[in-house]
Regions:
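A short, structure-level motif marking secondary-structure boundaries and short turns
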Residues: 6, 86-87
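Conserved P-loop
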Residues: 2-63, 67
């Protein structure tokens, strides 16, 4: 499953991304949430408001300040115990980087929030 949430800045992409993550968390699927936002701590309470429970067992937020940092941790995430990989704030991926990231997911669910349009 690959879901790309696209839109302009301020159109609620991250909120929609969190809503989809909450749906998976309610199903007791493990979610890793990789973001460029330093204030990601608040996302846990948002997920709980959306009905997600047991976050300490199923939810792992991670901060990577830029694309290079994200690509460095991507192999670690890909081999971790996660059912869903959510990416927030990495809108400068080109098609090749996007394709590489998809290969690293090992056929897990991927949700990307971005203002970028991809050809795949």
């Amino acid at each position: 499953m690959y879901v790309v949430i696209s839109g302009e800045k301020g159109e609620g992409k991250t909120t929609e991304l969190l809503r989809l993550c909450a749906t998976h968390l309610k199903e007791k699927k493990t979610v890793v949430f990789l973001t460029t936002r330093e204030d990601y701590d608040g996302f846990a309470s948002t997920l709980e408001e959306m009905g997600a429970k047991d976050l300490k067992h199923y939810y792992r937020p991670m901060y990577a300040k830029d694309l290079q940092s994200a690509m460095e941790v991507a192999p670690i995430i890909a081999h971790g115990p996660y059912d869903v990989i959510a990416l927030d704030g990495y809108s400068k991926l080109d098609d090749k980087q996007y394709e590489e990231l998809m290969k690293l997911t090992n056929e897990r669910g991927v949700i990307i929030s971005t203002s970028q349009k991809y050809s795949n």
